[in-house]
Amino acid sequence: GRTLADAVNNADVFLGCSAPGVLTADMLKTMADKPIILALANPEPEIRPELAKAVRPDCIIATGRSDYPNQVNNVLCFPYIFRGALDCGATKITESMKLACVREIAALAKQDVSDEVAAAYQGKELTFGPDYLIPTPFDTRLILRIAPAVAQAAEESGVATRPIPAY
């Protein structure tokens, strides 16, 4: 059978949602140039970012942990999807509502952060790039952008039961 080492050889992306330490330094060395590593096992990722960067300085890595850059966590989605759904009385969560959320997160990542957010993350580079792919969980713009976009998507897909409030 095929092993994980076989699967990651020359791979561009590793998506892990499994167990701590399963992606080894030797495996990472075999990946394509500028690999994207999504090591999302919690609380310990499949490979720690400091090890990944030591072995492959060209990699982009995200984990589910708040103590590393690029925290991929549902905390960026769920509260704002629900806020938008509740605000318009959505009868269900649709794919278009989830996509509206994701698109707003992507758009926010490319914009300059507020002074308030920068102060909360003193000393961390919060400019779109390898160490800042998605907004931080404490970015106050998330609720202001995502909830209305989700409510709008609910209205457009016919699941809203009341008008969208002014945000």
Region spans (language model):
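Short, Asp-centered acidic motifs that coordinate Mg2+ and/or phosphate
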Residues: 12-13, 36, 60
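Adenosine-phosphate binding glycine-rich loop
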Residues: 39-147, 151-163
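Short linear loop/turn motifs
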Residues: 165-167
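A structured beta-alpha segment of the ubiquitous adenosine-cofactor-binding alpha/beta core
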Residues: 1-30
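Short, conserved loop/helix-junction motifs that constitute active-site signature segments
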Residues: 28-34, 53-56
